[in-house]
A protein has these predicted regions:
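A short, well-ordered alpha-helix in the C-terminal region of glycosyltransferases
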Residues: 197, 325, 343, 351-366, ...
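Short His-centered aromatic/hydrophobic patch
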Residues: 93-99, 117
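A conserved mid-protein helix/loop that constitutes part of the nucleotide-sugar donor-binding site
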Residues: 19-27, 206-229, 250, 335, ...
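Acidic donor-binding loop of glycosyltransferase active sites
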Residues: 279-293, 306-307
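Glycosyltransferase donor-sugar binding loop
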Residues: 42-47, 177, 211, 235-251
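A short, active-site helix/loop in glycosyltransferases that binds the activated sugar's phosphate group
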Residues: 144-169, 177-182
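Short hydrophobic beta-strand element within catalytic cores of glycosyltransferases
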Residues: 41, 307-310, 320
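Conserved acidic donor-binding segment of nucleotide-sugar-dependent glycosyltransferases
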Residues: 322-323, 327-335, 343-349
């Protein structure tokens, strides 16, 4: 890389609401700034833009969330203008709709392009007739100079379902967490007390935390069905944004009442201080019924020295050590999930601490934010000198 000019990196993401992909984008932007790059982010906005402002990182508000073909087409020029005006050296895109715009903008400006595939891009789209169209729509992600995937599960899935020369440009970079941020020793008691008051939590019950946006495959219904079979006393908090899935959230609220769990399960909106939420809880559940590409909650929980219960599919198989840092159960097996929950509720403090220490070490050794950011930045550096 030339030393005479700070390299400008533009990350593009549909929105900056709560979520692992969004936080990862901000983490990399902050790491870039520390390493004398000029980071920028383009999105349709959201609550996490505050983090960018706080870090003095420039944000461009563009409707890159839209899948409307006209909007995608018009965004080509908008991204091209940013590239030219800000002298952007490399663009990193994390979703398909903005990737269509960014691909042509980068092609017109001869700018290096990186994509990150965060999911499997399910191919059973609407009906079998639309399958080829869905595959074409997805394939834009593989036209980048380097394609980053967040787990070996995703890499194997893509190589199995898509053909092309992109196999040589795929790089696995598992996501990471900021170890200090999720260090329970850094979370003050006042933050926890404030949160208990904010959520109006009972102090005489062990709290189960399920951090997940409200969408059907995250497993809210699976967890509720399992909770009806739990023998020990508990209180469960489901925290997350509905991301436009308001009908699904309403369905979950109704199910909680119908299953006589209104006094034991509470839904709260997404909020910023997740380390405090992890500290106040007894353990964490991530009951996805479809494979997670990676599953950031699993490593956040372990970094916070909390036991994690998750389903035995997707990225969880790469992040959780079964019966050492957490427990893995089959999707939809309500008996197994209820049994795992009861087992943790009955554990001694010594057993809980043993799992917590093992989880923290697992993340320190394999899933640190610094490692994830540095591996991503190394990809940028290689492309910028090629």
């Amino acid at each position: 890389m030339e030393d005479s000019k700070q390299k400008v990196i533009l990350q593009i993401i549909p929105s900056l609401e709560s979520g692992g992909v969004e936080r990862g984008t901000i983490d990399i932007a902050k790491s870039l700034k520390k390493q004398d790059f000029i980071p920028m982010v383009a999105s349709s906005g959201g609550v996490l833009t505050y983090d960018l402002r706080e870090a003095k990182i420039e944000h461009f508000e563009i409707d890159v969330k839209s899948k409307n073909p006209l909007t995608i087409f018009l965004n080509i020029k908008k991204i091209e203008n940013i590239i030219n005006e800000k002298k952007v050296d490399l663009v990193h895109v994390r979703s398909r709709a903005p990737m269509w715009s960014a691909y042509y903008a980068c092609k017109k400006t001869n700018t290096k392009l990186v994509s990150t595939v965060h999911g499997t891009y399910s191919l059973n789209f609407l009906s079998w007739q639309n399958f080829p169209l869905k595959k074409i729509y997805n394939s834009i992600m593989f036209r980048a100079d380097t394609v980053i995937v967040v787990s070996n599960y995703i890499k194997n899935y893509l190589l199995r379902n898509y053909k092309g020369t992109f196999a040589n440009s795929v790089e696995v970079i598992q996501r990471g967490v900021e170890l200090q941020y999720f260090n329970q020793e850094k979370v003050s008691k006042n933050r926890v007390i404030d949160l208990i008051k904010k959520w109006n939590l009972p102090e005489d019950k062990k709290t189960i935390l399920m951090p997940a946006r409200f969408t059907s495959w995250k497993g809210h219904e699976f967890l509720i069905d399992s909770l009806t079979k739990v023998k020990n006393d508990f209180f469960c908090v489901m925290v997350g944004s509905d991301h436009g899935h308001k009908k699904f959230r309403k369905k979950i609220e109704q199910k909680i009442v119908r299953d006589n769990l209104a006094s034991k399960v509470r839904i709260v909106d997404a909020f910023r201080d997740m380390p405090a939420a992890y500290r106040l809880c007894h353990f964490v559940v991530a009951p996805s019924v479809r494979p997670e590409a990676f599953g950031r909650v699993a490593i956040e929980a372990q970094a916070s020295s909390k036991i994690i219960v998750a389903t035995k599919i997707g990225g969880a198989l790469e992040t959780i050590i079964d019966e050492e840092t957490g427990f893995l159960v089959e999707p939809f097996d309500t008996e197994a999930l209820a049994k795992a929950i009861d087992k943790i509720l009955e554990m001694s403090k010594e057993e809980i601490n043993k799992f917590g220490l093992a989880g923290r070490k697992n993340v320190e050794d394999n899933f640190s934010n610094d490692s994830m950011c540095q591996k991503t930045i190394e990809v940028y550096k290689r492309l910028l000198i090629s």
